[in-house]
């Protein structure tokens, strides 16, 4: 996830797959017969970074397995996996928008895998002054949510349903909604029958 702070807050999140997440890193580490702590240790001793896909764990595995078969150093594969996460985050989430200024590294993988942070810092050419690694960075988002919710007034389920209904009825003039695939249950049932 990337959050840009400017005149307004812009959040960008990967909604397509697990590439770049802790689960992805766990899966890649298992290919090297280690865990994420071991992946971090291996990455410290690298010589070469290889291109590896991180869009999807399956694609990444098809890049990692041949490297293992060809005898590439596990250190090089480990750092290449971390660099793949960096590349995916920058290209897939930033989508060409520069990542500038101070950068705070939050969340589990960025807390527990310092070599991943290092890859981001080097790739983004961040200075030590621009690099922010808060204490308990893995908990900072949860703490923020608690602080934000502290002054909120609880509402009933009925009131929440009412608010959701109002949102559904509001019209966003910047986008045109798509027509529903089926306007009635009968149309849906006919579709299911046709495609069984």
Regions found by a protein language model. Name each.
Residues 1-6, 196:
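Gly/Thr-rich phosphate-binding beta-strand-loop-beta motif of the actin/hexokinase/Hsp70
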Residues 9-48, 138, 147-151:
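Glycine-rich phosphate-binding loop plus the immediately following alpha-helix
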Residues 12-20, 80-82, 109-110, 132-141:
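Active-site nucleophile and cofactor-binding loops and adjacent substrate-binding regions
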Residues 25-26, 133-170:
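Glycine-rich phosphate-binding/hydrolytic loop that grips phosphoryl groups
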Residues 60-91:
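Adenine-nucleotide phosphate-binding core of ATP-dependent small-molecule kinases
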Residues 94-123, 134-138:
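Glycine-rich phosphate-binding loops at beta-strand->alpha-helix junctions
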Residues 152-196:
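Flexible inter-domain linker/hinge segments
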